[in-house]
Amino acid sequence: MKNKLCLLLILSSFVLNIHAQKSIRIGIIGLDTSHSVAFTDLINGDKDNAFAKGFRIVAAYPYGSKTIESSAKRIPGYIKKVEQQGVEIVSSISELLDKVDCV
């Protein structure tokens, strides 16, 4: 019973923290496909988009797959595109997790 109560308190705290924020901060792992740019445009691009209201992509770790040459070549271009939408590029997944609420 004590464990359940502790879990309930922790989850309640998490939910209240998210509701207190202006928006839920989203992170992306991997800027090696066009999907990452498309999702960033959808969520960050149109302020009046009801689908994305309350959400914002704020950070991205660019490397999904460094070993697939065709994917790795696209990363620099996709970095520029998401930076134009206000996304911060981070150097590690650990750093990304410190900046976001969900990935």
Residue ranges of each PLM-predicted region?
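N-terminal glycine-/serine-/threonine-rich beta1-alpha1-beta2 phosphate-ribose binding loop
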Residues: 20-103
